[in-house]
Regions:
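Proline/glycine-enriched tight loop/beta-turn segments at coil->beta junctions
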Residues: 1-3
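Residue-level detector of conserved, well-ordered beta-strand and adjacent loop positions
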Residues: 6, 69-70, 113-114
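Amphipathic alpha-helical repeat scaffolds
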Residues: 7-11
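Short non-domain terminal segments
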Residues: 12, 36, 67, 96-99, ...
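Structural microenvironment flanking redox-active thiols in thiol-disulfide oxidoreductases
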Residues: 14-79
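Thiol-/selenol-based redox modules, centered on thioredoxin-like
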Residues: 81-84, 88-130
């Protein structure tokens, strides 16, 4: 599967990117795209809720149907090993919510995208490797 891995937050100015992520998922899930969303409270304390509250928010506000994991840290001593690998491959620490990482079918890092890069702006990169 092609993976788009994203650190997310419910109370961020970039939270509306959930819509773009869901649109990408709807469009490409049958071609092998999986979106893996990891809530994180490390940036501006913008993900204060419990895992259940986060899931309810995503379901009711954005109708999210892609994988939403439990809240984690993405930087620092308690960072998830997955995000340690991703930031090593990308060559930089995560600066804010909604940082995205594209992984090909072989499990290889393709590239990272900063917070400001909207999901629809990375569609061409997904199409090229799916």
């Amino acid at each position: 599967k092609t993976l788009l891995i994203v650190n997310v937050a419910s109370a961020c100015g970039f939270t509306p990117q959930y819509t773009g992520l869901q649109n990408l998922y709807d469009k490409y899930k049958d071609k092998g795209l999986e979106i893996l969303a990891f809530p994180c409270n490390q940036f501006g304390a913008q993900e204060k809720g419990t895992n259940e509250e986060i899931k309810d928010f995503c379901d009711t506000k954005y109708n999210v149907s892609f994988r939403l994991f439990n809240k984690i840290d993405v930087n620092g001593d308690n960072a998830s090993p997955l995000f340690v690998k991703l930031t090593e491959a990308d060559g930089r620490e995560i600066q804010w919510n909604f940082t995205k990482f594209l992984i090909n079918k072989e499990g290889e890092f393709v590239r990272g995208f900063g917070t400001q890069k909207k999901p629809e702006e990375i569609e061409e990169h997904i199409k090229a490797i799916i």
